[in-house]
Regions:
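Gly/Thr-rich phosphate-binding loop signature of adenosyl cofactor/nucleotide-binding cores
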Residues: 2-94
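Residue-level recognition of alpha-helix initiation/capping sites
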Residues: 84, 106-108
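Short acidic/polar active-site loop segments enriched in Thr and Asp
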Residues: 99
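Short, glycine/polar-rich helix-capping loops at beta-to-alpha or helix-loop-helix junctions
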Residues: 108-115
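Long, charge-dense
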Residues: 120-121
Length: 121
């Protein structure tokens, strides 16, 4: 992961706000929570986490310092769960102090994702 200010020098972490400002257009990211949520945390690992096991409720080896990337598989399974279950899963992720959530493939996040992440802001 590199900072927008020093593209040739690797950094150990990057603020979510800086990540969004630096790479949002290039990655075609769209903010679905309020701007205040960008100030909430820092991305501390260079890799992303596909939270496939977390969406089932298994958090034993959850990589909470990484961007949480929900792809088509995670979102399909997640949407099959009840709204209450989805809320619990996202609340558990937030309690583990994740830096941010990215939903790929132009998929929409669930209302529970948006609500819980906004409240954690």
């Amino acid at each position: 992961m590199t900072s927008s200010k020093t593209k040739s020098q690797a950094v150990e972490s990057i603020a979510v706000r800086e990540f969004f400002s630096s790479f949002g257009k290039q990655l075609k990211l769209r903010l679905v929570t309020s701007d205040k949520t960008l100030s909430r945390s820092t991305i501390k690992e260079k890799s992303v986490n596909r939270p496939a096991l977390a969406v089932t409720g298994y958090f034993k080896y959850f990589a909470n310092k990484r961007i949480q990337l929900f792809g088509a598989g995670e979102m399909a399974f997640f949407r099959e769960q009840s709204a209450a279950r989805r809320k619990v899963v996202v609340e558990t992720m937030v309690a583990k102090r994740i830096p941010c959530v990215v939903v790929s493939r132009s998929l929409a996040p669930t209302p529970e994702m948006v609500d819980v992440l906004e409240q954690a802001g």
